[in-house]
Amino acid sequence: MTPIDAKRPLQLNDQGQLRHFLSLDGLPRELLTEILDTADSFLEVGARAVKKVPLLRGKTVCNVFFENSTRTRTTFELAAQRLSADVISLNVSTSSTSKGETLFDTLRNLEAMAADMFVVRHSDSGAAHFIAEHVCPDVAVINGGDGRHAHPTQGMLDMLTIRRHKGSFENLSVAIVGDILHSRVARSDMLALKALGCPDIRVIGPKTLIPIGIEQYGVKVYTDLAEGLKDVDVVIMLRLQRERMAGGLLPSEGEFYRLFGLTTARLACAKPDAIVMHPGPINRGVEIESAVADGKHSVILNQVTYGIAVRMAVLSMAMSGQNAQRQFDQENAQ
């Protein structure tokens, strides 16, 4: 395995193009806008009789999911297939990692299969960065979610959803509600919203589920739902992540719903044309009532559709960036 050149930005090639997609932290607005524009152009592919374009023909994308997922894994598979790539999905529950093999050894074996791209989802923060730092330089790494750290493609599909329904970020008020402390989606959304120029980003939740120092992301903190939702354009609800919680952070799910669950009455605090989003899976009656999740303000299913296009954009752009870097290195080696 060959460590990446320490002088080269990990996510970008020497021309500033995407070569890995690990986090939204530090990526310029122009690149995020390019991802959104590229995803927009891919949306029509899903409406075709033959839902394929040949951009990744002959390439192999390996989905390495160490955490369970339905939407993320399926949409990455569909995205790669629609780009005409060959797709391998590793079933971690039956893989050697469940028998004691380390992440490093698993990576070495996958690399020996000559995959061109890894999509990695892992419970440990930083796992995708670790792989990108040690993988062969010709292989692109996409973060499908790592611990509490980042979920960059979810962040970008949320941005595409907002842009398609609201047009611009410049005058928006966006509220992110719920379990902020354990949410990699919240972090990615905050970074993307700030980079794209959203002037009013709010986080709402109980004090025990809001991380200390979150104001550094340029957000306003609210512990009262009605106050935080006042006149917002976008409401992003988050799932309570019981699997990541230590005891004592919440009295009960019922108490959380009583104070922070999104109901029709509470949504009335937002603007009349506000949209409601959720990364899924939804816990009905815990963070959101069914009347809201299935109602006229909800764009939750649109998020799933847009997720395929965003992941097509990221896969194609990262592969293009890898190819450009390879050509650049070859020319400069002569």
Curated annotation (Swiss-Prot):
The protein's assembly and partners: Heterododecamer (2C3:3R2) of six catalytic PyrB chains organized as two trimers (C3), and six regulatory PyrI chains organized as three dimers (R2).
EC nos: 2.1.3.2
Designated name of the protein: Aspartate carbamoyltransferase catalytic subunit
GO biological process: 'de novo' pyrimidine nucleobase biosynthetic process; 'de novo' UMP biosynthetic process; amino acid metabolic process
Enzyme class: transferase
Family membership: Belongs to the aspartate/ornithine carbamoyltransferase superfamily. ATCase family.
UniProt-annotated binding residues for L-aspartate: 99, 184, 239
Lineage start: Bacteria, Pseudomonadati, Pseudomonadota, Gammaproteobacteria, Pseudomonadales
SUPFAM superfamilies: Aspartate/ornithine carbamoyltransferase
Gene that this sequence comes from: pyrB
Pfam families: OTCace, OTCace_N
Reactions performed catalytically: carbamoyl phosphate + L-aspartate = N-carbamoyl-L-aspartate + phosphate + H(+)
Species name: Pseudomonas putida
GO molecular function, one term: aspartate carbamoyltransferase activity
Residues binding carbamoyl phosphate: 71-72, 121, 151, 154, 280-281
Any one annotated GO CC term: cytosol
Biological role: Catalyzes the condensation of carbamoyl phosphate and aspartate to form carbamoyl aspartate and inorganic phosphate, the committed step in the de novo pyrimidine nucleotide biosynthesis pathway.
PANTHER family, per the entry: ASPARTATE CARBAMOYLTRANSFERASE (PTHR45753:SF6), ORNITHINE CARBAMOYLTRANSFERASE, MITOCHONDRIAL (PTHR45753)
HAMAP family to which the protein is assigned, alphabetical: Asp_carb_tr
Pathway the protein contributes to: Pyrimidine metabolism; UMP biosynthesis via de novo pathway; (S)-dihydroorotate from bicarbonate: step 2/3
